[in-house]
From Swiss-Prot:
Residues 73-83, 91-103 have a biased composition (Polar residues). Residues 15-41 have a biased composition (Basic residues). This is Golgin subfamily A member 6-like protein 1. It comes from Homo sapiens (Human). Belongs to the GOLGA6 family.
Length: 668
């Protein structure tokens, strides 16, 4: 069977190739293939360069068979020697019938055999024509399917480009999300630190509040006791004043009734009583003034402490509100991130499904192309067979015509025209030889041209194939690199997301552990506070017993203790204020960082600054008040000195009174 040279058809530039499926080197994939079912096949197809000798030999054999049909003497089995003997016999004038009769079959048998052979060939030709028509129909159907599949491939290429653009957008979005995640993580870390500092401040403030409440209760109790004492002192004072008035009345009555000596003795006694009473009154007045001053100072301190407590409570509430707002913002950001991650997962799933559909469609296209290639090969083989059968049919027709001519010539001329026929046959042989020579020359020229064309085509096709192979290799390498980069990026993103989620979980667990620790610490603090309260109640009971036993000493010691406590509290307040200042400086730094991120926090920072200025003003006021207290203490010292001077004067007056009484007694 002849094998026609199959040209290396170029592949379509827009047809996607699967990297794992083998492509056929001779597979026609150009979309503009002929699809008409009645296209005529060209009869003069180029012959293969290796089959030129066989075609020449077949032509020579056909010419010899024609000669044997006319003249049975020209048998191909005899060879060149039989032709030489024929020429000799003709020249010698021998009978031609002797040469034609020996070693040949009858013409009727040859005609029957030729008719049978022709009928068999016709049947084969009809069957082959039927198969060719079926194959042409299948070819048209496959070409239509190829056209539609290529159209679908173009659509899928457009969809793939859209998906690639979406992928790039999703990568950009993923990068933005990573940046947002990093920003959120930093914000969360800052918020956690800020929350820890605020919790520490809250704990310190709660302890201060607890201590201040305890001191307030103690001061209230002391104030109540002092008020009771003041009431008692006032009642005693009123009683003493009544006693003084009664004594004065008694003196006046005694002056009127009793004699002078008794009057002097009673006057002396009453004077002593008056002096003692006046001294007691002065001492009580001084004590009352001191107690009033102390009460006023304690009330002022109570008011200040209450104001500070209210301010601290307001600050704590504001900080808790800030923390809640930050937690709400973080939750909203986490929800947004989760939604965006869900959208990303959905998009990736859609992309995977679409890629799977693309792969399936490409595999179907490859299978269709392979089917087309196989059917085209079958069609080419059938066309080759058709060409061979057409040649055989032409030869048989020529033979039949020649047989008819020969039979007519045999009937008409038989022996007389044998010599002419032989001469004609010789002339025909010479012409055939000349024609064969011409055919040989033409075939050689055609073969040379075909060889040149085929070499050029082969070179062009080889160059095209090399370029296409290079392009395909580059495309495959590029695709594999892109896929590897995409997979690496996706893996990195997934690893980052998982790491961030693990970090978030770890942070949440740490926060929970810290909260549990805080709860435990608060419970411990509460237990300690309860113990302290119990101990304080016991101490109070003991102090009350001691106060009942030693009222005066206890009062003085309490005053000293109160003063020392006040000093300690003031020192603690100063230390706390210094701590608060340091914390405020830290808070300012944090607020400056947050101010760059959020405008709302700027407003809150301004409020905090205003509050801090108020605190500074309050601290300045406290300093001024302390200075005033020092001035008041100096005034008290001065008053005490004046009191000492007054006492000295009273003593001098008493001495003068005694001298005057002595003079009176001496005069009497």
């Amino acid at each position: 069977m002849l094998m026609w040279p199959q040209p290396h058809l170029p592949t379509h530039p827009h047809l996607p190739t699967h990297p794992h499926l083998p492509t056929h080197p001779h597979l026609p994939t150009h979309p503009h293939l002929p699809t008409h079912p009645h296209l005529p096949t060209h009869p003069h197809l180029p012959t293969h360069p290796m089959m030129s000798k066989e075609t020449r030999q077949s032509k020579l054999a056909e010419a010899k068979e024609q000669l044997t049909d006319h003249h049975p003497q020209t048998n191909p089995s005899v060879g060149t020697a039989a032709s030489d003997t024929k020429k000799k016999k003709i020249n010698n004038g021998t009978n031609p019938e002797t040469t034609t009769s020996g070693g040949c079959h009858s013409p009727e048998d040859e005609q029957k055999a030729s008719h049978q052979h022709q009928e068999a060939l016709r049947r084969e030709l009809e069957a082959q024509v039927h198969t060719i028509r079926i194959l042409t129909c299948q070819k048209t159907e496959l070409q239509m399917a190829l056209y539609y599949s290529q159209h679908a491939v173009k659509q899928l290429e457009g969809e793939a480009r859209d998906l690639i653009s979406r992928l790039h957008d999703s990568w950009k979005f993923a990068g933005e999300l990573e940046q947002a995640l990093s920003a959120v993580a930093t914000q969360k870390k800052k918020a956690d630190r800020y929350i820890e500092e605020l919790t520490k401040e809250r704990d310190a403030l709660s302890l201060e509040l607890y201590r201040n409440t305890i001191t307030d209760e103690e001061l209230k109790e002391k104030n109540a006791k002092l008020q009771e004492k003041l009431q008692l002192v006032e009642s005693e004072k009123s009683e003493i004043q009544l006693n003084v008035k009664e004594l004065k009345r008694k003196l006046e009555r005694a002056k009127l009734l009793l004699p002078q000596q008794q009057l002097q003795a009673e006057a002396d006694h009453l004077g002593k009583e008056l002096q003692s009473v006046s001294a007691k009154l002065q001492a009580q007045v001084e004590e009352n003034e001191l107690w009033n001053r102390l009460n006023q100072q304690q009330e002022e301190k109570m008011w200040r402490q209450e104001e500070k407590i209210q301010e601290w409570e307001e600050k704590i509430q504001e900080q808790e509100e800030k923390i809640r707002e930050q937690e709400e913002k973080i939750r909203e950001q986490e929800e947004k991130m989760r939604r965006q991650e869900e959208m990303m997962w959905e998009k990736e799933e859609k992309m995977r499904r679409q890629e799977e559909m693309m792969w399936e469609k490409e595999e179907k296209m490859r299978r269709l192309e392979e089917m087309m290639w196989e059917k085209e090969e079958k069609i080419r083989e059938l066309e080759e067979k058709m060409h061979e059968q057409e040649k055989i049919r032409e030869q048989e027709e020529k033979r039949q015509e020649e047989e008819k001519i020969r039979e007519q010539e045999k009937r008409q001329e038989q022996e007389a025209k044998m010599w002419r026929q032989e001469e004609k046959i010789r002339e025909q042989e010479e012409k055939i030889r000349e024609q064969e020579k011409k055919m040989w020359r033409q075939e050689e020229k055609i073969h040379e041209q075909e060889k040149i064309r085929e070499e050029e085509k082969r070179q062009e096709q080889e160059e095209m194939w090399r370029q296409e192979e290079k392009i395909r290799e580059q495309e495959e390498i590029w695709r594999q690199k892109e896929k590897m980069h995409e997979q690496e990026k996706i893996r990195k993103q997934e690893e980052k997301v998982w790491r961030q989620e693990e970090k978030m979980h770890d942070q949440e667990e740490k926060i929970r552990e810290q909260e549990e620790k805080m709860w435990r610490q608060e419970e411990k603090i509460r237990e300690q506070e309860e113990k302290i309260r119990e101990q304080e109640e016991k101490i109070r009971e003991q102090e009350e017993m001691m106060q009942e036993q030693e009222e005066k000493m206890g009062e003085q010691e309490e005053k000293m203790q109160e003063q020392e406590k006040m000093r300690r509290q003031e020192e603690k307040i100063r230390e706390q204020e210094e701590k608060i200042r340091e914390q405020k400086e830290k808070i300012r730094e944090q607020e400056e960082k947050i101010w760059e991120q959020e405008e709302k926090i700027r407003e809150q920072e301004e409020m905090m600054q205003e509050q801090e200025e108020k605190m500074w003003e309050q601290e300045e006021k406290m300093c001024e008040q302390e200075e005033k207290m020092q001035e008041q203490e100096e005034k008290m010292r001065r008053q005490e000195e004046k009191m000492w001077e007054q006492e000295v004067r009273l003593r001098q007056q008493e001495e003068k009174m005694q001298e005057h009484q002595e003079h009176l007694e001496a005069a009497i």
